[in-house]
Amino acid sequence: MDNYPKLEEMMLLSNGAPQFLGAAGTPEGSGGNNSSSSSSSSSGGGGGGGSNSGSSAFNPQGEPSEQPYEHLTTESFSDIALNNEKALVETSYPSQTTRLPPITYTGRFSLEPAPNSGNTLWPEPLFSLVSGLVSMTNPPTSSSSAPSPAASSSSSASQSPPLSCAVPSNDSSPIYSAAPTFPTPNTDIFPEPQSQAFPGSAGTALQYPPPAYPATKGGFQVPMIPDYLFPQQQGDLSLGTPDQKPFQGLENRTQQPSLTPLSTIKAFATQSGSQDLKALNNTYQSQLIKPSRMRKYPNRPSKTPPHERPYACPVESCDRRFSRSDELTRHIRIHTGQKPFQCRICMRNFSRSDHLTTHIRTHTGEKPFACDICGRKFARSDERKRHTKIHLRQKDKKADKSVVASSAASSLSSYPSPVATSYPSPATTSFPSPVPTSYSSPGSSTYPSPAHSGFPSPSVATTYASVPPAFPAQVSTFQSAGVSNSFSTSTGLSDMTATFSPRTIEIC
């Protein structure tokens, strides 16, 4: 409030000088400077009823003195009100030419509200200065669900001790223009919370109404979650409302046997003792998921003798024995149904690692096994082995076909072919046939020519004598009609031989 003397001086210069000049009496002295001071009284509690007035008198030398107030009238004072907040009565300096009596002025606070707040007595800088100093004595109550920074600042200002100026509650927006308030905040900017997780304490009062929907009665709402997600949870949870079903206990659930522990497998592998074997056998009997399958050939003896297969299956209904502990481990997974190897691509589980390896090749397309005969590739070695058997069967079939063909050829070679005998027959019958007929025919004696005597020569006789033994078979085999035909046609040939000379016969 240190700025009020300056405000009063400005008001003295503007409004109060004519009034005090008219109200002054006879001059008592001339010259001298009168200094004015302000006296203000503050009313506690934000301004109470009534008015407080203070007065002070000064002599021309500036020293205070006791002077009566009868020479001042009430008409000489002017009430100045700013927004119904403060009314000041200011006095002006007396004339500088005459000596005035001691000046007395009073300041008064008016508590009467004005119908309008458009008072323009004070300039704008003073108005903004006062608006920054005055705080609201009784802030309006507004329902809001979320506090804002501006609202929190106004609430902190309301807790400060109020000033002497009284502010009406009906028109306070011009004064508080520097710090705007939000009586009804927008729900888009300040959304309401969905629910109250914890109710407020009994001592704290809510400054906003509760939400329209009722709050939860039984505490937090426990959602219905499947039982298999809480394998270790006990069945004593009672946080939900009565209409909700509590979690099922472990007693009501089916006991699923666990997978084969590694310690159990090692105990079987090391053959710790007969008592341990009996106890572990009982545990295995209780943990079986599916019944043990019987052997395909139970009476068939194994290739390895029993003393070389120390690892026996602990299941009573299974008499399998193994020479290696890892083989027993894989076999036990058949009884327990354990599949510890999982494909990361299709999430399929396998009981053996080699099965997983071959399965992954179906995703990658890898085929490392190739056929040695045709070059075809396979992802598994057993597939290549099965394919190789196809080539072996084809080879056996080809061998069988070759044997059949050779046997058929040998059987055909034992019988003479008619084609082979057909070719020498005309040659044998055509050439030697005219010779004997020429000698055996009765017409041979009818040739008394001296050339006839040339036939029994040793050279001719020996040549003709050697001809019949060279072809005995052909002559004997062809005692057919063809021969008879040759003889039947020999009549014409005999006529031709009659014309032949002995020299042509020798050439033949």
From Swiss-Prot:
<dbReference type="GO" id="GO:0035035">
    <property type="term" value="F:histone acetyltransferase binding"/>
</dbReference>
<dbReference type="GO" id="GO:0035914">
    <property type="term" value="P:skeletal muscle cell differentiation"/>
</dbReference>
<keyword id="KW-0090">Biological rhythms</keyword>
<dbReference type="GO" id="GO:0032922">
    <property type="term" value="P:circadian regulation of gene expression"/>
</dbReference>
<dbReference type="GO" id="GO:0005737">
    <property type="term" value="C:cytoplasm"/>
</dbReference>
<dbReference type="GO" id="GO:0044729">
    <property type="term" value="F:hemi-methylated DNA-binding"/>
</dbReference>
<feature type="region of interest" description="Disordered">
    <location>
        <begin position="382"/>
        <end position="453"/>
    </location>
</feature>
<keyword id="KW-0010">Activator</keyword>
<dbReference type="GO" id="GO:2000182">
    <property type="term" value="P:regulation of progesterone biosynthetic process"/>
</dbReference>
<dbReference type="GO" id="GO:0045944">
    <property type="term" value="P:positive regulation of transcription by RNA polymerase II"/>
</dbReference>
<dbReference type="GO" id="GO:0007611">
    <property type="term" value="P:learning or memory"/>
</dbReference>
<dbReference type="GO" id="GO:0060086">
    <property type="term" value="P:circadian temperature homeostasis"/>
</dbReference>
<dbReference type="GO" id="GO:0044029">
    <property type="term" value="P:positive regulation of gene expression via chromosomal CpG island demethylation"/>
</dbReference>
<dbReference type="GO" id="GO:0042220">
    <property type="term" value="P:response to cocaine"/>
</dbReference>
<dbReference type="GO" id="GO:0006355">
    <property type="term" value="P:regulation of DNA-templated transcription"/>
</dbReference>
<dbReference type="GO" id="GO:0071371">
    <property type="term" value="P:cellular response to gonadotropin stimulus"/>
</dbReference>
<dbReference type="GO" id="GO:0019899">
    <property type="term" value="F:enzyme binding"/>
</dbReference>
<dbReference type="GO" id="GO:0001975">
    <property type="term" value="P:response to amphetamine"/>
</dbReference>
<keyword id="KW-0963">Cytoplasm</keyword>
<dbReference type="Pfam" id="PF11928">
    <property type="entry name" value="DUF3446"/>
</dbReference>
<feature type="site" description="Interaction with DNA">
    <location>
        <position position="309"/>
    </location>
</feature>
<dbReference type="GO" id="GO:0000978">
    <property type="term" value="F:RNA polymerase II cis-regulatory region sequence-specific DNA binding"/>
</dbReference>
<dbReference type="GO" id="GO:0051602">
    <property type="term" value="P:response to electrical stimulus"/>
</dbReference>
<feature type="site" description="Interaction with DNA">
    <location>
        <position position="348"/>
    </location>
</feature>
<keyword id="KW-0863">Zinc-finger</keyword>
<dbReference type="GO" id="GO:0031667">
    <property type="term" value="P:response to nutrient levels"/>
</dbReference>
<dbReference type="GO" id="GO:1990837">
    <property type="term" value="F:sequence-specific double-stranded DNA binding"/>
</dbReference>
<feature type="repeat" description="5">
    <location>
        <begin position="445"/>
        <end position="452"/>
    </location>
</feature>
<feature type="zinc finger region" description="C2H2-type 3">
    <location>
        <begin position="369"/>
        <end position="391"/>
    </location>
</feature>
<keyword id="KW-0677">Repeat</keyword>
<feature type="region of interest" description="7 X 8 AA tandem repeats of [TS](2)-[FY]-[PS]-S-P-[GSAV]-X">
    <location>
        <begin position="413"/>
        <end position="468"/>
    </location>
</feature>
<feature type="compositionally biased region" description="Low complexity">
    <location>
        <begin position="402"/>
        <end position="450"/>
    </location>
</feature>
<feature type="repeat" description="6">
    <location>
        <begin position="453"/>
        <end position="460"/>
    </location>
</feature>
<dbReference type="GO" id="GO:0003690">
    <property type="term" value="F:double-stranded DNA binding"/>
</dbReference>
<dbReference type="GO" id="GO:0007616">
    <property type="term" value="P:long-term memory"/>
</dbReference>
<dbReference type="GO" id="GO:0000979">
    <property type="term" value="F:RNA polymerase II core promoter sequence-specific DNA binding"/>
</dbReference>
<dbReference type="GO" id="GO:0002931">
    <property type="term" value="P:response to ischemia"/>
</dbReference>
<dbReference type="GO" id="GO:0032354">
    <property type="term" value="P:response to follicle-stimulating hormone"/>
</dbReference>
<feature type="site" description="Interaction with DNA">
    <location>
        <position position="386"/>
    </location>
</feature>
<dbReference type="GO" id="GO:0006357">
    <property type="term" value="P:regulation of transcription by RNA polymerase II"/>
</dbReference>
<dbReference type="GO" id="GO:0071466">
    <property type="term" value="P:cellular response to xenobiotic stimulus"/>
</dbReference>
<keyword id="KW-0539">Nucleus</keyword>
